[in-house]
């Protein structure tokens, strides 16, 4: 009986997958239905459950938060109509909208805010609200947040723009489904402009317009409902397959357009290729739990082995800028350029070899260094084709100094699991951030094992980060970020990788897309796809 049920279940899932795949292909030509191609797959729609970009992208559409930033970084009301801060900076009181409903039909109240913030404090992204002591309900539409210490960044940390961790789920749905909330499609209930209707993992996500939505923030011209009736997000990991789907108009948008295909597609009538600078923080990370990487000289040797210009040319086809620090140059709080130039390891393979010699790694047979009988052999874990191309360039550069690296391309979920179980030797991670806070908390002790999957735990690093979160002096806060960055570079915690552009291919049938410089499609309230 059990076997028969399992067979039926698998058959149903396969049928649903085929329906979604076929419907997505048809929908790309349908008005009011937006079909998006993306290279990674979502795995959880519980806000704050993890920091995976596919989850965050969809959660922007499913949920709202108390406040939100516009496309220029200005803060605006969302589920909160207004707020007040006490003179000592420790108490924030929010007046909530009273006209908001969840997708379940239940009214949104202060109890939902308290429930999510209380839960968030135990989630992997809890460092974002480290300052939060407690949440009190004053009445159905008034909530009060008490902080452990005053901070300049509390509103930023609870803005939906800061990765949608603060999106408020339906507390009753969370209670009903428990650990399955955000994992089962039927569990998800937010207040956002779109409702989750279908979800086949690693294949497609189908969202429908929330017809009751009328409380959109003023960052959009349209307060709701959305103009689009349906949004389908297709997972297409292979770059060539995604570009082909775009070219055949099986998808309307490729949100992660291949830099190899961009020049060719740019000349196609009706198809726009958008290359937009982003605040990206991409890094190669050493697993500091592994003995090989516990010697600072070894880590610095590998930093000197990296030729950033070659990576930009080969892996990114010129659509990137060589890294000159951990933070991108346009990021507030980065170490001044002239100071970073004094400490940032330049490409110098001779110096890299010298440092390895000094660290006791001597050249052995097959041009592979050995120390205490252990070869300088390791694996770089990646999860996209572009990352694999980049890692292949690094592979050749590292071989020149006597290392024997392998590259392991994995499905994103498997990569995440490997990070949490610290099986990796070295990993590549790409990220886009709206603030220096968003990139920094990955490298503090309390973020181990995720998102601090380099397992770096250092008292000074934590002190600098704490200053950024607790000082009430903006100049001191930015200076602390600079010292945080200095520490990462001087201790060779990671190897910064080139800062990339947002590469998007979009057909001219899509109107008023208004891409966000960090989050891309963002909330899609103004976007249209009218019929021909």
Indicate where each model-derived feature is located:
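N-terminal lobe/hinge region of extracytoplasmic solute-binding protein
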Residues: 37-87, 118, 189, 505
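Gly/Pro-rich hinge or "lid" segments in bacterial periplasmic/extracellular proteins
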Residues: 72-74, 161-232, 240, 348-358
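Structural transition elements
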Residues: 194, 287, 322-365, 383-389
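Ligand-site clamp/hinge motif
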Residues: 119, 213-264, 386, 395, ...
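Extracytoplasmic/peripheral linker and loop segments enriched in polar/acidic and small residues
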Residues: 345, 354, 405-415, 440-508, ...
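Extracellular/periplasmic solute-recognition and catalytic clefts
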Residues: 135-137, 197-208, 234-290, 297, ...
